Amino acid sequence: MVLIFGEKAITLEHNDFFTMIHKYLLTLAGVAPLATWAGTGKVQTVTTNESRPNIIMFLVDDMGWQDTSVPFYNNQQSKLNQRFRTPNMERLAQLGVRFTEAYACAISSPTRCSLMSGMNASRHRVTNWTLELDQKTDASSEVIGLPEWNYNGIQPDSVAGKYNNATAITALPQILKNNGYFTIHCGKAHFGARNTPGADPATMGFDVN
């Protein structure tokens, strides 16, 4: 994942990836306090006269941290980094923010829900793929008992309480939209189960899907 905004390069070294998103993205969006979003899932719109930088966020499936010419471990290229030539990614990293310490779940839905909500998987409780309404996607096992999880995914706070096994949130794109941004989603969403509002990126604050 590459996160870009601003006009100068900033290297972030922090174990809490989501705290970094709160601190830098939401501060630039003019939203405060950050703890309100993280703790309750609701944020009030705050106006600001400061200029707003463009924000581009990439979530890339199955891309290793050494699969580009941009070093993500530290500022030095590894031997694997040197195998690749990705000058556009180098430029994006130079102009934006490069996270050098982060955590992502092993499958896509929990990570996507974390990016939208600012919560880790233990908080939003989406720990596997979301798919059909009210249906788990767990593999069956006679040995291991699997914990209950939110298989209906994340949902916009406008439908809070309507769906079982779901977490209602004010999504990051909605916060940005409320503060003057035009928001675009491209590609896979996989936030909520099919036939729920959370399955449609437009309900999460994206102007264009």
Positions of the model-derived regions?
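Formylglycine-dependent sulfatase
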Residues: 21-23, 39-209
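Bacterial Sec-dependent N-terminal signal peptides
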Residues: 1-50
